[in-house]
Amino acid sequence: MYFFLTLNKNGDVGYFPAGEKDRLPPGICCLKRPLPLGLIQNAQDWTNKRKKGRFWGSGLKERQCDRVKSELCRLLNGQEWNVPKLSSQEDFVTSDCQLASSIDGRELMFQAFDELVLGRQLSWGELKILARELRCEAEIILAFAHLNVERNMAEWVPAVVPQGKGWQCQRCGERNIKEWPSYYGRAGTCLSCKTLGPSTSLEAFYRDHRPLLKGQENVNFYPHWPLTEAQNLASGQVLAFLNNSAQPKALLWAACGSGKTEVCFPSAARALEEGKSVLFAAPRQDVIHDVAPRLKRDFPGVPIQVLTGSVPIRYQRGNLVLATTHQVLRFWQAFDVIFLDEMDAFPYQGSEALEWGLTHALRPKGKLIYLTATPSLEALKEVRRGNMLLIRLPARHHRYPLPIPVVEKYRNPFDPKSNLLSLNKARFESIRQAGRILVFVPKISWIQPWVNCFRRYFPDWKIEGSYSSDKERFDKISDLRQGKFDLFVSTTILERGITLEGIQVVVLGAEHPIFDERALVQMAGRVGRTRENPSGTIVFMSCSNSTAMKTAIQWIKDQNRLALKQGLIDLRT
């Protein structure tokens, strides 16, 4: 997306979208060829610096303006000027009234556009998609966007900008930018967020500065289920954090299956009532699609945006937003309150780009609450340093303690070609008596061999397996939810975000490096989640007792110890 550089009688440099050239007011002096926004902003910086020095000297403004044109022509490699006949200084200035003429007869369309871009950061390609959804020409959307820029409600920013000796993407913050020669000189392209569309130094983003809400709201909040005692305690602390705490961040460390998401609903309702915008974010879209019906159930009548890669409608209206962390990159300082679920999950964990995007989606003085059952070491360090408030939710709703994993050591490796299963047939039969079995393995290559192995030893059982790239994955998991399998073999794709009634868990090769303490806690957290089946069996089968296994078991025991101390669980014999 390119812009025309404009110049007024005072020597002030401005710009106008290239697609809007026909709408330029009469008397505007501009370059004949459009330029990338970054070059125009360099020219603006150049003229502003010269104004502060002796460059201008004395004399008529017309002579000064001619000198600026000459210098800018040299600076921009010989660009030629389109100079109209001028009658007054006002002829050089793009007035708000002239820009507003672009919406004459399109007031309803402009209103729709205005509501859909609040707090957004959008590329030219995304603005064209919005034009298709509003069933209008892209040039009209461009005029609407520039009108907001002229009214200081938004700005155009280069997608990738020079930073020191390198570059930085303005959408995801990435500094590892691919550099290449262009017609306009050296240019940079960000590959980190390319799935959202191109981001180069020759492109520009429309960045809207307005919040999603313009005032207090009447919010209908009707919780479907009352909060438990443990949830009420945590919910009160979340509310106190939002209202009173000077700290900008909090960590809600919850037991698996304790209902941490619902704990945040009362605080979200209060924030909306106060005119604050709220975002529920998560790395994985299946979490978003799981939370969406629960939010819609408890917030009837509240418009909610649900934004994931699989949702066909990209632009929605709503004061309450549910989005994957990738979709959050399309917002800029839009939210007063952000709840991030599963902060330790892929692809957010370890992604500086997604972390940068989430931070920059928060408004100044906004609050960020991380929700997880398995906090990262970095988050725990922030808590210890006093930079992040810690809130604990150690108990599930049924007041049973969390099941503790049992470690069973074996000499033989857990390669499916080994004779291990023949030695443990009775063990698996014993576990099956307690409920259906979910078996976790560390490698995709182990799935089918173990499925075949189990089928050979248990011919009467219904046995299946799946992994991330399995084309039948969703159908198999649907059948698993319906209880159609006696035993199911999986990689870590099922370690979180799924509740299976009466399931028992076995982790084969639990000492494998891919199974860190967070993965092991999450896998153990599949057991005992419902009131009908509040307990169960978790077995870590391994050749050794790894540090991750010890840490995972210690974390689970610590949750039970804290819950018992607070009177949130009952002793069981």
Can you name each region flagged by the protein language model?
Residues L116, S123, I129-K214:
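Interdomain "pre-motor" coupling segment immediately N-terminal to P-loop NTPase/helicase cores
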Residues P223-P248:
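N-terminal pre-P-loop "Q-motif" helix
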Residues L251-T261, A271-L272, K276-V291, R427-R455:
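Conserved strand-helix element at the start of the C-terminal RecA-like helicase core
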Residues A282-D290, R294-K296, I304-Q316, A323-R330, ...:
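Conserved helicase motor
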Residues E342-F346, R481-D486, S490-P534, S542-T547, ...:
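Conserved RecA-like helicase motor core of SF1/SF2 enzymes
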Residues R363-E378, A524-W555:
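Conserved segment of the helicase C-terminal RecA-like domain
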